[in-house]
């Protein structure tokens, strides 16, 4: 019943707004790229019915290798084991298929590799999906001075680079579980 109560929904929205203020972020639009957001798409839609979900997919082996190398902490222990990564990734794919069947109009799939190859085309798709006006500065995101709180802050301040595409190939001899299961 908590989610049926409009007062509770307002309070939850307000709490999230307070959380965002911790990052000195005052813009009308925000991007929350927390790695586990995919688990909460139904809840996100309930709290923020106008929210758009940009689902950036990537080659599963490259994606899992990236997670493995990042040494995440706090609830992301599945990233420390190839077997756990494979299981988690398959569960993630299943859950995303469910969310897309429930909320097809709020989820846009963008392939990471396509974004790297033709970033202008893919960024324009995102802008259109979000009902925003195109601004050529979107191509120069790395020059934006807005606050960023993410493990990849240094990457976000650089132009798009291609070195992560097919990065798994260099390590495939050490990650046989990922290679065989994904």
List each model region and its residues.
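Conserved phosphate-donor/acceptor-positioning beta-strand/loop module used by diverse small-molecule
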Residues: 44-68, 126
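Acidic-histidine catalytic/liganding microenvironments
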Residues: 34, 48, 103-104
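Glycine-rich phosphate-binding loop used to anchor ATP phosphates in small-molecule kinases
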Residues: 11-45
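Acidic, metal-coordinating catalytic cores used for nucleic-acid/nucleotide bond scission
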Residues: 35-36, 114-118
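Hydrophobic/aromatic-lined pockets within catalytic cores
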Residues: 39, 49, 131
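PAPS-dependent sulfotransferases, especially Golgi type II membrane carbohydrate sulfotransferases
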Residues: 1-25, 65-109, 116-182
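Beta-sheet entry/capping signal
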Residues: 28-29, 50-54, 106-109
């Amino acid at each position: 019943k908590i989610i049926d109560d409009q007062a509770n929904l307002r309070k939850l929205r307000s709490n999230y707004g307070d959380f965002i203020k911790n990052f000195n972020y005052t813009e009308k639009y925000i991007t929350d790229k927390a790695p586990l957001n995919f688990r909460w798409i139904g809840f996100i839609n309930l709290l923020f019915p106008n929210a758009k979900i940009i689902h950036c997919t990537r080659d599963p082996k490259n994606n899992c290798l990236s997670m493995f190398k990042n040494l995440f902490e706090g609830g992301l222990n599945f990233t420390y084991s190839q077997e756990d990564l494979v299981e988690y990734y398959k569960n993630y794919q299943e859950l995303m298929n469910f969310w897309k069947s429930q909320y097809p109009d709020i989820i846009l799939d963008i392939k990471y590799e396509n974004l790297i190859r033709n970033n202008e085309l893919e960024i324009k798709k995102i802008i259109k999906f979000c009902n925003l006006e195109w601004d050529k500065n979107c191509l120069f995101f790395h020059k934006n001075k807005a606050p960023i709180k993410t493990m990849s802050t240094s990457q976000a301040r650089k132009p798009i680079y291609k070195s992560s595409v097919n990065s798994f190939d260099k390590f495939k001899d050490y990650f046989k579980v990922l290679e065989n299961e994904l």
